[in-house]
């Protein structure tokens, strides 16, 4: 069975309309993950709406509303197999207001494909997504320079090199090692260099997207870290009881384990664990599971709670120290500012009580102690007090629960990681 292959979560990131969904659709289509008759149906539907070129992207779109608008909304979990891995696609939509989806999506990703349209080059969201991917700990990256069929002239090597240079500069700035990142000229729509090398880019001798995916390193599963499962949803299933759903970030969950949910502070015994509607005896990092806990009611826990073992419970912060980088803010950030922190599945308003130091974003060394304010482009060490209880861990101890994004005014203001926690 395919599941004996190692599993990777793959995010597709990049600016809106640069072709992320089309590339995913093309990939799934080429890898035989979609039936021919479904593609045919999509082709007809798209043509009827006057969106003939949307056929592959439609594979990713499951919501009626999205189709009418012609954009991808929710994070779609799709899967396809290569000869080496099986991938779950965490499709990260590109529209501005969907960045917070990306925050929850990208933090689940082992690797990302950055899609940049050759005619446009680097755009605002290209920068934002690269930045977030880096901050959220996505260390493996593949760059697909897409829409090569739309350059002047088509499949122009010069334009490819210009965009490659521009993207390379951006990646270096946030700390990716450029020599480890493959850059691939593609046309997702026509299939050039996605699975097979294209005759239209004879000047390119590097890997296809498929080659690059197979060359990714298998992530080490953090099984030895304490158990942490952020709750995404809670269901009440008749005959079973309360079933929280979430992704195991660290540790191992076994049937019969005594677990506690924080900050709800309720505990119970694990009766059963399910993955894709199949019961399993234990769950490992990366598994998206539903688990039933004896003695816990549907209203006892909610999204944003974190499940851990009773003898090593998740840390509830009274306050914490963090390192952040300000992505964008219309004015300046000073002590007393209370935006919303998105950490794992929790969204909690937190007050920045003190700006301890301003850092050089490239090196991390201190530029200024106790600055009065910080603004776009600055990196800083801050003290934070959540307005209500929330779980956050030191990034050095449990990185998966130590990273966060800060949002306000419908945009991502900053991204950061927790360095120290004062437990409640």
From Swiss-Prot:
Q: What's one GO MF term for it?
A: GTPase activity
Q: Where does Mg(2+) bind?
A: 21
Region (G4) residue spans: 146-149
Main localization of the protein? cytoplasm
Q: Which CDD domains match?
A: EF1_alpha, EF1_alpha_II, EF1_alpha_III
Q: Which PANTHER family match?
A: TRANSLATION FACTOR (PTHR23115)
**What is the name attached to this protein's record?**
Elongation factor 1-alpha
Q: Supply the source organism for this entry.
A: Methanothrix thermoacetophila (strain DSM 6194 / JCM 14653 / NBRC 101360 / PT) (Methanosaeta thermophila)
Gene, per the UniProt record:
tuf
């Amino acid at each position: 069975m395919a599941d004996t292959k190692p599993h990777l979560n793959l995010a597709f990131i990049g600016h809106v309309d640069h072709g992320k969904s089309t590339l995913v659709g093309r990939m799934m289509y080429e890898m035989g993950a979609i039936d021919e008759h479904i593609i045919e149906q999509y082709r007809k539907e798209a043509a009827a709406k006057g969106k003939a070129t949307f056929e592959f992207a439609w594979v990713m779109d499951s919501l009626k509303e999205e189709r009418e608008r012609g954009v991808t909304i929710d994070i779609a979990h799709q899967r396809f197999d290569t000869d080496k891995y099986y991938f779950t696609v965490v499709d990260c939509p590109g529209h501005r207001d969907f960045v917070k989806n990306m925050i929850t999506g990208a933090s689940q990703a082992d690797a990302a494909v950055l899609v940049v349209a050759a005619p446009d080059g680097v755009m605002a969201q290209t920068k934002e997504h690269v930045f977030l991917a880096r901050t959220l700990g996505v260390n493996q990256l593949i760059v697909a320079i897409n829409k090569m069929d739309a350059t002047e002239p088509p499949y122009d090597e010069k334009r490819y090199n210009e965009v490659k240079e521009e993207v390379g500069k951006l990646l270096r700035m946030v700390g990716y090692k450029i020599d480890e990142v493959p850059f691939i000229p593609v046309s997702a729509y026509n299939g050039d260099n996605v699975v097979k090398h294209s005759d239209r880019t004879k000047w390119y001798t590097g890997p296809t997207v498929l080659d690059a995916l197979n060359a990714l390193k298998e992530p080490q599963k953090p099984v030895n870290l304490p158990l942490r499962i952020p709750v995404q949803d809670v269901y009440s299933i008749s005959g079973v009881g309360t079933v929280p759903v979430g992704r195991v970030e660290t540790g191992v969950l076994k049937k019969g384990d005594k677990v506690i949910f924080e900050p709800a502070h309720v505990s119970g015994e694990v009766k059963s664990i399910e993955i894709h509607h199949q019961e399993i005896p234990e769950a490992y990092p990366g598994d998206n599971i539903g688990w039933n806990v004896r003695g816990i009611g549907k209203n006892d826990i909610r999204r944003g709670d974190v499940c851990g073992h009773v003898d090593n419970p998740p840390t509830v912060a009274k306050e914490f120290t963090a390192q952040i980088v300000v992505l964008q803010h219309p004015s300046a950030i000073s002590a007393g500012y209370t935006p919303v922190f998105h950490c794992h599945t929790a969204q909690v308003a937190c007050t920045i009580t003190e700006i301890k130091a301003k850092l050089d974003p490239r090196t991390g060394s201190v530029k200024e102690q106790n600055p009065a304010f910080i603004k776009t482009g600055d990196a800083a060490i801050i003290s934070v007090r959540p307005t209500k209880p929330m779980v956050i861990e030191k990034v050095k101890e449990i990185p998966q629960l130590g990273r966060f994004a800060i949002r306000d005014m419908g945009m991502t203001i900053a991204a950061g990681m927790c360095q120290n926690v004062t437990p409640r």
